[in-house]
UniProtKB/Swiss-Prot annotation:
Lineage: Bacteria, Bacillati, Actinomycetota, Actinomycetes, Mycobacteriales
GO cellular component: plasma membrane
PTM annotation (N-acetylserine): residues: S2
Entry keyword set: Acetylation
Record-stated family: To M.leprae ML0607.
Record's keyword annotation contains Acetylation: yes
Entry protein name: Uncharacterized protein Rv2569c
Superkingdom of the source species: Bacteria
PANTHER family xref list: BLR2979 PROTEIN (PTHR33490:SF7), BLR5614 PROTEIN-RELATED (PTHR33490)
């Protein structure tokens, strides 16, 4: 998703959205079999509720199932056996999203020195996994050097997050198509350009380089049209951002979200689909096809709109 200057100011109260995420694959020859798996169902949490969800696949799959992974993400599997040249996957959701708790960014751990957010003891044991580097490694000397100006000793955690998001937003250019899902953080550092996935992964590497537990979050961001303009259907996109684990009292924890693509902290405009250690844990779609096709085209459209109903209709 691109950085968008038309984002509205944070809203008050719970908001209901309808999300339509459509992916179409077109092939130059017949595909005889398609296996797919995707993370397309919004999560349920204390501040988010998936009111309704429908996944439509055309041609209809001969086999499909739904499961939940170790991080609590909902995964959808399908196998299409009908010969086809076009495969369309449409995910429709109705989601309620509430604002962050009062004080999440203005009191408690957010105002404590960032060093205090490093996982420790039993409360932090489940978060330790999110402090670890990836394979191949992404925490390099270049990442540590880039992170250093934000992580001043004893600086309040929320100031670190705001500063890191702001620096990435300022130092890097959003350029669609400039990277792929296999582009590493250090390549992005050198090129100084990328997309939301790259900026989220850079922020995560910086946080982990300093011992904090950070996760990759995939989902959607509700945006407003420019003043005086009608909302255009399908212009939104999947989005990605970072979250850092913080210990709360007593024996609780919270994830504080930062969005370096748009230079802001996460609020009720953000709809969470998946959480993981990296993009590879929660890709919207991936799969295997059997075909002699030499070429393929993929079209993706996403629409996130305020909604007042409580049911999905055709």
């Amino acid at each position: 998703m691109s950085a968008d200057s038309s984002l509205s100011l944070p809203l008050s109260g719970t908001h209901r959205y309808r999300v339509t995420h459509r992916t179409e694959y077109r092939y130059s020859d017949v595909v005889t079999s398609s296996y797919g798996r995707g993370f397309l169902t919004p999560r349920n949490s204390l501040r988010q509720r998936c009111v309704a969800h429908r996944l439509t696949i055309d041609p209809a799959p001969a086999d499909r199932s739904t499961s939940r992974d170790g991080y609590g993400n909902i995964s959808s599997y399908f196998h299409v056996t009908e010969p086809h040249r076009t495969l369309t996957i449409t995910s429709d959701s109705i989601v309620d999203v509430s604002p962050p708790p009062p004080g999440l960014y203005t009191s408690g751990p957010a105002l404590q020195p960032w060093e205090a957010a490093r996982p420790a003891g039993l409360p932090g044991s489940l978060a330790t996994e999110f402090t670890l580097d990836l394979n191949p490694p992404e925490i390099t000397d270049a990442v540590r050097e880039y992170a250093a100006p934000s992580f001043l000793p004893k600086r309040p955690l929320v100031e670190v997050l705001r500063d890191l998001a702001s620096r990435i937003y300022t130092d890097f250019t959003y350029r669609s198509g400039s990277t792929t899902i296999s582009t590493g953080v250090n390549e992005v550092l050198l090129a100084r350009e990328g997309v939301c996935q790259d900026f989220a992964r850079l922020a995560i590497a910086c946080l982990r380089a300093n011992g904090l537990a950070a996760c990759y979050v995939s989902g959607y961001l509700a945006t407003d049209p420019p003043p005086g303009k009608d909302r255009m259907i399908g212009i939104d996109a999947t989005h990605a951002w970072a979250s850092v684990w913080t210990p709360q009292q007593p024996g609780r924890f919270e994830w504080l979200g930062l969005d370096p693509t748009n230079d802001q902290l996460v609020d009720q405009r953000y709809i969470v689909v998946g959480r993981g250690r990296d993009y590879a844990d929660v890709p919207p779609l991936r799969g295997i096809i059997y075909t002699n096709s030499e070429n393929s085209v993929i079209d993706v459209s996403v629409d996130v709109v305020p909604f007042e109903g409580d049911a999905l209709h055709a």
